Design a protein with these regions (language model features):
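Short, hydrophobic/aromatic-enriched beta-strand segments in well-ordered soluble domains
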Residues: 4, 106-108
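Hydrophobic-ligand binding "helix-grip"
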Residues: 24, 28-29, 38, 42, ...
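Hydrophobic ligand-binding cavity/cleft-lining segments
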Residues: 1-33
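Hydrophobic pocket/interface hotspot
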Residues: 13, 23, 47, 64, ...
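A conserved amphipathic terminal alpha-helix motif
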Residues: 81, 110-142
Length: 142
């Protein structure tokens, strides 16, 4: 589980999780970069993130399970690199914290044992990258 206080209210953080263009800036732990993000944010809607991880191409796919705006987001998560294939579940909880801040909690369940540590570290880096984007007011960098 990863927790991070972000410099924006829950509604603004929620929007980041549903905006493919903005998500391209923070979703993958650097140096990996998303090459394409497709989101259909509704229960049963699909998500897909194609990634270039220093020359290795992989895809994250899943389905939205729950969207409780702006509090809770749940979706399945499967990586094309996982052998054997597996489905895990990501739960993102957004709680008001202080003045115009959000406590974001990311819980990633049902992960294959061999990727537990890398995903824990990856979500921590993603939290840092999202914080940096929100600190800039959501402005894209190149």
């Amino acid at each position: 589980m990863v927790r991070r206080v972000l410099p924006a209210p829950p509604a603004a953080v929620w929007e980041e999780w549903l905006d493919a263009e903005g998500m391209a800036e923070w979703m993958c732990p650097r140096p990996a970069r998303p090459t394409k993000i497709e989101l259909d944010p509704r229960p049963g809607g699909e998500l897909r993130i194609d990634i270039d991880d220093e020359g290795a191409e992989l895809s994250i796919t899943g389905r939205y399970l729950e969207l409780d705006e702006p509090r809770r987001l749940r979706f399945t998560w499967s990586c094309s690199a996982w052998q054997p294939p597996a489905n895990s579940v990501v739960t993102v909880t957004l709680t008001p914290h202080g003045d115009e801040q959000t406590l974001m909690t990311i819980h990633h369940a049902k992960l294959p044992p061999d990727v537990l540590d890398s995903h824990q570290n990856g979500w921590a880096l993603i939290g840092e990258q999202l914080e940096a984007r929100l600190t800039r007011g959501g402005q894209r960098t190149r």
